[in-house]
Every structure is written in C-alpha cells, then in structure tokens.
Amino acid sequence: MNKQDFCLIYLFLALGGRVTVREHNLFSSIMKHEGYDDADIKEVCRNTMSIIASAYSDNDREAIIRHQFEKYSQDNTKKGNTVHNRTVLWTLINLGFSDSSYSKAEQRLVHLFAKNMNLGKSYVLEMEDTAKALLSVQQEKEFLDSLEQSGKRNKIYTELELTQKSLHKQISTLVQLG
C-alpha cells in the first residue's frame, strides 16, 4: 500500500473525532509491516489531521472525510476488483472492528469505498461477517485468559486459536482471489 492509501485509512480512523492510542499503534504496525518508518508514519498522520482540522462538528468531519474518499476514488487508477483494493478494503473493515464497535459512519465509508472501487456488496458483507467472527473469537480468548488454567479451558482456547487461524486463512483467500 502507498502513502495515499494510508492517508485514507488514517482518515477513516479519525472519523470518530480522535484516533485512540490502540488504533494508532495498529495503524503504525501496519505501515511498518509495509516497509515504512516512523518518519513516514508521522508524515501521514500529520497530513491526515491537517485535512480534518477545519471540521466544526462530527457531521462536518464526516463530510470532509467522505469527500476525501470520493477524491481518492477519482484519483485511483487501480479501480476494480484488484488485490490492492481488496487489501485496502480489508484494512478499513479490520480497523473498523478494532475498537469492538463498527459504527454506522465507518460502515458507510467502507461501503462507499467498495462501491467506488467496483467491489461487490456481497464481497463486502462477507468480509464484514468474517471481521465480526474474528472479533468474537478474540473476545472469547480474552475471557478465557481471565480464567484459571484447566484442561477444559486450554482445550477451548486451542479450538478458538484454530478457528482464528481458519478465519485469517479465509480472509487471505478472499483478498487474493476475490
């Protein structure tokens, strides 16, 4: 993914008015995984926040971000059901669920992106369902972490890890093959 993709993703994170420390750390780890350094991350964050600095209200901020999503779509020459666009889509959905609440505003932007990139609605819904399942599995694992170690607990935890791996494989296949 390029810096323009990451600006779009950071705008998505800023939709709620601020980017949480957890969201920022996830964002940074994704950029680093893609080969960017701390200076690149700061540049993207600074540029992104300057775009929405003029927002007077939540609705105004959402309108500014929506406009940037539209502009991204117009500037993007890679329209269509490509691995690149599916990767950006999954990143948006995954980060949308990262705070355990995928808001209606986040969902609207995800669907706008998918529509503008000519990605099918059923494809988006499948990704959203997989993200919900991953979130549920993660929450179950966190609950089990709070329990005392036992054979039954460990067996359930192992089953959840297998389910999680299976869901990650499903997403990888969805992104690669469409």
Q: Over which residues does each language-model region extend?
A:
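Small-residue-enriched hydrophobic alpha-helices in membranes
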Residues: 1-178
